[in-house]
């Protein structure tokens, strides 16, 4: 099983999403459900890091990025021999040039 490392930007993305859903949309149960599915997805990634599709872009990227949907969001991560880095957690309809 790979060690999971959360980059600060990914942690911020997750907190922003949960806060928006819980407080702006006044849907705390939906926020809890999203967090539960996020946690389950990360556990699956730790066990099977290559199971999800590669993120394709025309721009050159230093690391190979993979993506997996989590409800209306997309989790982006990179796999290394000793760890998986959770890079971003973005709303599914958001533009991707900021990866």
Where are these regions (language model features)?
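Arg/Lys-rich, positively charged N-terminal/basic patches that mediate binding to nucleic acids
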Residues: 1-37
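Secondary-structure transition/hinge residues
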Residues: 22-25, 46, 50-53, 94
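A short, surface-exposed loop/turn module that caps and links secondary-structure elements
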Residues: 43-69
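Enriched for short, Lys/Arg-rich terminal
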Residues: 25, 63-66, 70-99
């Amino acid at each position: 099983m790979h060690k999971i490392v959360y980059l600060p930007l990914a942690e911020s993305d997750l907190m922003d999403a949960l806060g928006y859903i819980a407080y702006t949309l006044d849907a705390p149960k939906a926020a809890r459900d999203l967090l539960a599915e996020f946690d389950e997805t990360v556990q699956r990634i730790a066990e099977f890091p290559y199971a999800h599709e590669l993120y394709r872009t025309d721009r050159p990227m230093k690391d190979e990025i993979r993506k997996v949907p989590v409800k209306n969001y997309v989790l982006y991560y990179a796999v290394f021999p000793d760890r998986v880095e959770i890079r971003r957690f973005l709303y599914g309809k958001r533009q991707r040039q900021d990866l």
